[in-house]
Amino acid sequence: EAFDYAFKDGSFTQAALIIKDGKLIYERYRGITDNEADILASTSSSNSDQSFYKDLLNQRDKDSLISSWSTAKSFTSFLIGIAIESGHINSINDYASNYIQEWSRDDRSSVTVKDLLDMRSGLVPICFNVSSGELGNCLNSSDSASGGNIVYANDQLTKCINRELATEGLKYPWYENGANEYINGSFVYSNCDTMVLGEIIFRATGQDIQTYADYNLFSKLNIEAFWWRDYELYGQSNGNYLAYCCLDSTASDFAKFGYMLLLGGISDG
């Protein structure tokens, strides 16, 4: 009954599993429905062809890759922990400017790795402007809270690094829709904060986040996962990996990661 509810038309659910005592005891999969494809086509700003979504998401099974979207942030945070354990990063209290040298000579030098992990960096959030096709400051709280749709921009990392610190006491449209003055240390959901964490891993370890995860995490869990990249030709690896989202893997492999977290970071094989 619970699975019937989870898979009802309009839920967009395509996979669900139950893990008990480390064992997979139930799983169900389905492709996208006609109604769901219609919804995607009618709300998308990039593709309004219903058949595109039906062809892309029509059949789902245990081997189908599923995109994590923002669940990838948990993987990035875990990799920061691995980098600390391996000595590449000293601690979460390190100044981010130790690795992002662009911040070392201005007020952004006070931002710590922990601030980025907690999304309390104080850096102005940026959003994708559909009309201009460019990234810029978010114009309202709703766009900011959704992550700004920066995934549509060709080069996301540069803009994420080049953000300025917000000024306490000023009103910003992205902070409570400009109704109240900004307070330092406030939580502001930000894809860019996590995108910068991916670059910190790259600069601290000398490996992009995909390569670092393949060896230090994915292989240990016996899973395969594939990170999306932006279109910056001279980035980390012919494109900068989107540390804040878009990690593709199977539902069962995602479950292995989740179960490992449930066990406090211990792999159950």
Regions found by a protein language model. Give the residues of each.
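Active-site SXXK
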Residues: 22, 49, 55, 65-92, ...
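Active-site helix/loop module of the DD-peptidase/beta-lactamase fold
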Residues: 56-57, 62, 67, 85-128, ...
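Acidic/His-rich structured neighborhood in mature extracellular/periplasmic domains
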Residues: 182, 190-194
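Catalytic loop of the DD-peptidase/beta-lactamase superfamily, centered on the K-T-G motif
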Residues: 1-20, 219, 240, 262-269
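Glycine-rich, acidic and aromatic/proline-enriched surface loops and short helix-turn segments
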Residues: 21-33, 45-46, 118-123, 163, ...
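Short, charged, amphipathic alpha-helices and their helix-cap/turn boundaries
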Residues: 38-56, 97-98, 132-182, 207-226
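Beta-propeller domains
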Residues: 192, 198-199, 203-204, 210
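A short, well-structured edge-of-sheet supersecondary motif
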Residues: 6-57
